[in-house]
């Protein structure tokens, strides 16, 4: 069990992200039902059916929340029990376990409350809201605010306001998309669009106010933004939040046109809302990643300066030649262990045990090896983006460009982790205990999947419109997961300088995925523009990778 603590730590971030998504959808569904569907149900031609569908979606979100919380709390309990000599009952008295248990109970209570038998009357409205408020309160006790010694009450309230804003806006968008798809009347679209716009404005205001307060108390100053991992991740959240505001503004304009002209198409409203869901959920995973790092105000030492950022990112020619595998630090350490064991006529031990928590040694050749990998990956992505642009421009025979993803995946599988099979001594399966190896393999699997699907779609082997959506979805997932990617480097500054490169990579990946989604789903000029945007985002990813430095 001790050898799995690192991988469990990473899985806990992923589970926390899923928990935030499920919680926001659950609370958003309650608010959408209580403040939009039920008050206007008599004005909507399919009001009763819409209420049933929204309630069903909210119930499934609550079930997802239960499963995510059970898995998350169970994982944390297992890790604590394996590292500290405490009984199960003792661990379950910890604040995270109590808060998780309350959230599970609240989600369980919501399921019968959202059934049709309890959907009418004052009780049908008040009870889900009260249970949702209890759920939200418990959720705030798993945030940084609970651990603060100063301004604890204020920050707990602010955290609650922040999560409320995310729920009433982002968490309710799936309900909004469902409503638009089930309603077929222009007047109904106008009512739902106008009401949800007001709900979204409340959410935006809540997020801006609470986010501003948290920036003051958790980041403190401008150097905290660019000089700490917490500040960099908050910056990524702000960038995606601004993208959501632009999409929301576009939808508000459609809603206003719909109010003046009932013949206005709502297709853009639906497609932009779909992208808002994707970017919003990515923000939730960034928020989950924030829980694994201390607030910037607590990290006064080892901050990265602007000078260090400028030096690290100074222009330099890409590294196109690789050092020998035998020159890497782990290879040299293993060779020395083998030599010493041979002199003693004993079996040699492993230089590094996967999952042991011991950070691997690094030397200049390790840095060169990593830079070589990133730079050649950048060349792959640059070429892919260029070929996709040329194919978009009408060069039909370039439709096979997605096959380059398979070459890139093979390159990364072999080179990303030199201490692991096939180049190193660590076995293929045992290396899964290493969190960085597991993340690299996950990305390789994603690259293979979206490469195969996109090639099959472009060559006509897969003709289903749903198959075409696999590529943008997986690209977006890859970008979101890159926000949670970690490196096993002991030097805090070096780790942050690497993260400063990976964060824009993630944002460009998310942008490219959802731009491709719009190309496929949005008819007319908007879709055509998106078709040119996403290959450019790929080329931007390539440029960033070619710019990558570790020293």
Could you say what each language-model-derived stretch is?
Residues 427-456, 505-514, 518:
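Short, solvent-exposed interaction modules
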Residues 112, 407-420, 432, 460, ...:
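Alpha-helical transmembrane segments and their helix-helix packing motifs
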Residues 1-368, 390-401, 451, 455-460, ...:
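Polytopic transmembrane helical bundles with strong interfacial aromatic enrichment
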Residues 71-87, 414-435:
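Helix-loop junctions on the outward
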Residues 475-486, 509-515:
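A motif-centric signal for short, conserved binding hotspots located
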Residues 225-227, 367-371, 393-398, 423-442, ...:
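Membrane-helix interface and helix-disruption motif detector
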Residues 96-104, 128, 372-379, 439-445, ...:
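Structural signature of hydrophobic alpha-helical transmembrane segments
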